Every structure is written in C-alpha cells, then in structure tokens.
Amino acid sequence: MRTTYGSAVFAEHVPSVSAPWVAELEARGWVTVGKTNLHELAYGVTSQNLHYGVVPNPRFPALTAGGSSGGSAAALVLGEADAALGTDTGGSIRIPAACCGVVGLKPTYGLVSTEGVFPLAPTFDHAGPMALSVDGCATLLQLELPSVGLADLRVGSAWGGVTGEPVDFPTAEAVVPAFMREVGDVHRELYPEHAELYGENIREKIERCIAVSDAEYETAVRARDELRERAEEALDGYDVLVTPVLSCPVPPVDCVELEVRAAMTLYTFPFNALGWPALAVRGVQVAGRPGDDALVLAAGRAFE
C-alpha cells in the first residue's frame, strides 16, 4: 500500500513489508482499511498538508483537526475505522485526539515497535493506538485494565488539571534542541537532495533543526536528564498525573502552524522527552510512570 509519510519526497513509495505492529494486528484478525493523511513527515500539529490537503475536523469544522496524526482521528469520528494507529513525537496522537474528540495513547517508550515508521526524532518517537474509547485503545495493545477509578488512586494535578492534588511538574522547553538535532540528523542528507519537494513550513523547521549546534544539543541532553529527575520527584507519592492536553484553545482550521506549535505541544512534549505513557481523553491528559500504561488507561476511563 502506498505510504507517503505525507511527503512529496515519498509520493510513490510502496513498502515491501508491513510494519511489525501492523503485521501483528493483522495476524490477530484486524483488517487494514486504508492509510490516512497527516502533517507532512509527521512534523506539525495541524495536519495542514500542502501536498495532500488539509485534514478536516469532522466534529468542529471551523477548528484544526490537530496533528500530526490528524487523519487517524478524523477517520474515527467519521466511522471509517474502528481503531487507528498514529505516531507521537511531541504530541501527535494526543493533540488530534483532543481536537477531534477521540481517545489516543502515547505508550511507554518502546512498548510499541516503531520499526517501519519513518523517523522524526528517534529517541522521542512513539507509535500508539487511537480509538473512540479507552477500551478500544487497550484492545489494540492487548492490555487488561485494572478495575480502578480515580477515587482508588493517588492523583496529582499539573498545569490546571481538572482533578487531583497540585504538583509542581516540569515542562520541557529546554529539551527541544535535542529533539531538533535528532530531526536534523534524519534529514541532513535527504533535505539537500530534495529541498524543493518539502512544504514551505517544513523547510523552515528542517533548516532550523539542521543548524542546531553540538553545544546546544549537549545542553539540551543535560536538560533532559534533569527533567527525568525533577519529574520523578514531582510524581513521588502519586499513581498518575492529570493535566490538560492543550495549553490553549483549539486553533482555527486556517491557523499558521508555526505560530501555534509551541502552545499546542507545551503539555504533551514533556512525556515524549520522558518516555512516560500519556493518554488523551476528552481533552484531559492522564500520564504515569514507564510501564504503567494499563493503569493510565484505567484512570482515563473516569473521564469518558
């Protein structure tokens, strides 16, 4: 099946084999009904694709569908699939889930294989499920959820979360240059050969990423280590953390992606940098420690 990654560079690309996670799901009886549109090269939060069109938001047509996995969220709302797969490097499953009113999980880093996925920033990249319900996401991952509710858990709350005890949980702006350097490394040879095939706002972002210096990268790597320490300390004594998915209202469909990107990823990107599981359900984000995916999903049921 043609797999473009939302890019004109790969317009005629047809993989010779399915990604392992897709092959596993098909072996379990799932049927692939199609591929969905996305933000070019999974590097954007609005799914405004200059090559293949803008992904519509079926629930709220005046607003962005979010990205980068906007097509997966839209397909679920339209009833074109029972479940969908997405990737999430800075919020690309959770943001469209929040914008379109579906459920999406960024699992613990490494829980789902990213083999067969065109990389964006490899140590931040995650693949995960999207569905109309928490149980739908759990089914894709073959996770059995514990029978617990928020009342059974110690819940921390950050950044204006709707429930729980206030927690001083860190954001991750200082880590962004590490993410950018990884993006730059992926495209360092590809971009000069095919620059004219990259969309305009993607070109600008890729050029910034390629320009990240060794010193900026090393500083950001140290900031990532500090983030891990601060996050562990902040969640000490709690089972899960509840936050908003977005730090801003859902932008209009014709927004300028570069102007809304930082605000839309402010609360999602930290969990990519940490590798912790994080669920988006009804605009609420539920996060937990690595390996606690089933617990995060179970807690998320409280918001359905």
Predicted features, each with a name:
Residues 50-53, 100-104, 178-183, 260-261:
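Short, hinge-like loop/turn segments at secondary-structure boundaries
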Residues 18, 26-27, 212, 216-304:
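Glycine-rich, small-residue loops and helix-cap segments
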Residues 124-131, 174, 191-194:
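A short glycine-threonine-serine/GTX helix/turn-capping micro-motif
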Residues 9-13, 125-132, 206-212:
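Short, well-ordered beta-strand elements within core beta-sheets of diverse protein domains
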Residues 1-8, 152-161, 177-228, 232, ...:
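Short helix-loop capping/hinge segments that flank enzyme active sites or metal/cofactor-binding pockets
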Residues 23, 27, 77-159, 218, ...:
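Structural helix-boundary/capping segments
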Residues 1-89:
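Gly/Ser-rich catalytic/binding loops embedded in alpha/beta enzyme cores
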